[in-house]
From Swiss-Prot:
Region forming the signal peptide: none
A Gene Ontology biological process term: regulation of DNA-templated transcription
Protein name: RNA-binding protein Hfq
One Pfam family this sequence matches: Hfq
Organism, as annotated: Alkaliphilus metalliredigens (strain QYMF)
Gene that this sequence comes from: hfq
Entry keywords, A to Z: RNA-binding, Stress response
Lineage, broadest ranks: Bacteria, Bacillati, Bacillota, Clostridia, Peptostreptococcales
Subunit structure: Homohexamer.
Length: 80
């Protein structure tokens, strides 16, 4: 059976686990900076300056991490 990797979940889980700061660009151009505290299929919880924000994924255009994410390392851990 082939393992399907959900790239979105791998990315969000790694920035959450490693406490990597991200910048989220919304479709309206607004920027949010902070740390991912949790996520599900529809939302991301972002901690920004000690305040939590619930962001709907359909409103997100782009997510930029402050450091590069190694997808190969993350996908191996999930496959184990």
């Amino acid at each position: 059976m082939k393992n399907n990797i959900n790239l979105q979940d791998v990315f969000l889980n790694q920035v959450r686990k490693e406490n990597i700061q991200i910048t989220i660009y919304l479709v309206n151009g607004f920027q949010l900076k902070g740390f991912v505290k949790g996520f599900d299929n529809y939302t991301i919880v972002l901690d920004s300056d000690g305040k939590q924000q619930l962001i709907y994924k359909h409103a997100i255009s782009t997510i930029l991490p402050i450091t590069p994410i190694n997808f190969m390392q993350s996908s191996k851990k999930q496959g184990e």
